[in-house]
Amino acid sequence: MSLVPDEPSEESLYQHKPELLRSARELFRRGEVIFTLAERDIRAQYKQAVLGIAWALLTPLISLVLLFILAKNVKSFSIGGNVPTILTMYVGLITFGLFGGAIGGGSNSLVANKALMAKSHFPRECFPLSQILGSAFTSLMATVPLAILFTVHGFAPKLTSLWAPLYVAIEIPFMIGLVLLVSSVIVQMRDLQQIIPIVMPLVMLITVLEPLNQEMHKHLVPNARFVLGHGWLRDVYCFVNPMAPIVDNVRSSVLLGFGPQWSTLILGLCGSLVYLVVGFVVFKKLEVNFADLT
């Protein structure tokens, strides 16, 4: 399939006035392009690797080992309770990994595809959005070691795991908004390419290692002080970092049998929608400068 249509769509997105719904319809219509770009990147990522697709399994396992070592050696994050430590870590890691992979890959997507952008007429949002699909593939592969861990520890996921798709749905607008924002800003500020790999691991550690719910905190981190005990601090944190309530709810539903914590989820959803709108507006405002890439 050719990625370059015969002629531009009449509903071209290269307009100065952002129109979110109109652009959403256009992107939905060009969904095949996004899937094709994602498939191309996945094939290119593993094509020349000796271990090939196995890296999709090894990468989260390596991250898990590092996270496990950190949790065992930093007293304030010593995890205990009835839930196996490694499961606690890994479920949080997979959930955050979907977001982290999308931002890590999407942030550089416009710069990396400047040659294709110069001769294509489909919406430029397709490039960063395709990275979300690529990250989803990696996260899906990472569930294979998770199934093995459940079997080894004789620990079955709870029935409340069925809530997980809802939590991921809340994560989607956050990923879309932030990947559009970061990828467009990087076109103007290339230094941000060096900052993202430094910031993302720090955000991951804070998000994965600090539960929001006090009851879950007692199960997962019994020896640590409940930092987010103040209501206003927790609310601001959930709004600014929607991944916190998402990771928190996924982990508590899968491992502890808790239902949705609606107070934190609603804050996370509101934050996600704000990121979506801001990311889209900034992307469209800066889009006129993308020609500088060519």
For each feature predicted by the language model, list its residue ranges:
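Hydrophobic transmembrane alpha-helices and immediately adjacent juxtamembrane helices
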Residues: 1-294
